[in-house]
From Swiss-Prot:
Family: Belongs to the CENP-N/CHL4 family.
Stated name of the protein: Centromere protein N-B
GO cellular component assignments: chromosome, centromeric region; nucleoplasm
Compartment annotation: Nucleus; Chromosome, Centromere
Origin organism lineage: Eukaryota, Metazoa, Chordata, Craniata, Vertebrata
Keyword presence, Nuclease: no
Keyword terms: Centromere, Chromosome, Nucleus
Length: 348
């Protein structure tokens, strides 16, 4: 086994949490059951990693085996990366609509290798998802195994979740995906998150849907604590009930997909009367700014704003529409009419 390959396997093992090392190695499936039984997890992790490499050298591990280990690791810890959603469209007519994983892999590799031979491609299926790992190289250098691109594709859906894709490799990657999946177009959606499962929940519409306004209001018993002292009155009970009901109409009552960021790019022209007109209003270029909201769980944070009294209910649709429009990046511009002073805000 080459020295660089042994080093790559060793570094992958060192990234594993100590308590999960045995589980990951078992999922990897390269080491035999007897080898796993004789294997001893020891501190420091360097000792454990060296022992794994020794087993791999004895069994002549290849790059494919190392890539499989990397796939298992990134599947288990997918939240360590930021994922972007791509949507394909205009599916090509085919006599057989059933997904053939072998044909997909063949066409994907063929499409990329037709342009660049110095690329390693590996696949691994996890349930209904096909994971793809691509390490890109150049004419002068071998594929960089430490900066691989990962793509997750669910057959019979037009969505692909990608992380680690550089701009230079994006056209080739997108071309390979549409050819292999038998679509004709693909575009990047304005939707990103570290939580891969939450992105799937959004585009597959698996998250809790809010109930319509014609539903009966929640019982007050569920909204408020028991009144210990009957002399205590809740003067704002009606307002709390209204806020709770509007919040449920907007976001539902169940758990929401986990997103960490939402950004809004504002583009508008300065407008002022003649007394206030100056250099700014004379400039034809629009004013631009970016507003970003961040939180470990942004949608839950937004849902809690009105009940906490921080914002009025209902919450602005610019915030509440995130899961339904399947995007967390917006551009807000103005609809300009023929009259230069007439404009209306709009969001894209």
């Amino acid at each position: 086994m080459d020295e660089w390959l042994a080093e790559f396997i060793k570094r992958t093992i060192l990234k594993l949490p100590f308590s999960e090392t045995a589980t990951i190695l078992k999922t990897w499936g390269f080491l035999t059951e007897s080898e796993l039984q004789t294997f001893t997890l020891r501190y420091p992790k360097e000792v454990t990693a060296t022992e794994v490499v020794r087993f791999c050298e004895a069994r002549n591990a290849t790059l494919d085996h190392a890539a499989a280990l990397d796939l298992v690791f990134n599947h288990a810890y997918s939240n360590k990366k930021t994922w972007t959603v791509y949507q394909m469209s205009k599916r090509l007519e085919s006599e057989n609509d059933l997904f053939d994983a072998s044909e997909f892999k063949l066409q994907f590799k063929k499409s990329i290798h037709a342009v660049s031979k110095n690329v390693t491609i590996n696949f691994k299926e996890f349930g209904e998802a096909l994971w793809i790992r691509i390490a890109w190289g150049t004419h002068n250098s071998r594929p960089n195994q430490y900066k691989a691109t990962f793509a997750v594709y669910h057959s019979q859906t037009p969505y692909v979740f990608i992380t680690g894709l550089g701009k230079a490799c994006q056209p080739l990657m997108c071309q390979a995906l549409v050819i292999a999946s038998k679509y004709s177009q693909i575009q990047e959606m304005e939707l990103k998150s570290r939580c891969l499962e939450s992105l799937k929940d959004i585009v597959f519409k698996r998250f809790n849907q809010p109930f319509s306004s014609h539903h009966s209001k929640p019982h007050e018993k569920a909204l408020t604590p028991n009144i210990v002292d009957p002399r205590v009155t809740y003067e704002n009970m009606r307002e709390k009930d209204r806020v709770y009901h509007l919040t449920c109409e907007t976001f539902g009552e169940g758990p929401l997909p986990k997103l960490e960021l939402a950004s809004y790019k504002l583009e508008t022209m300065f407008k002022a009367d003649s007394a206030m007109s100056g250099n700014l209003t004379a400039v034809n270029e629009p004013f631009r700014c970016v507003v970003k909201f961040s939180s470990p769980h942004l949608l839950e944070a937004i849902r809690s704003l009105a009940p906490a009294g921080i914002a009025e209910a209902p919450i602005s649709t610019l915030l509440s529409c995130i899961p339904h429009k399947a995007r967390n990046s917006f551009k807000i511009t103005e609809k300009r009419s023929m009259h230069p002073s007439s404009s209306q805000p709009t969001n894209v």
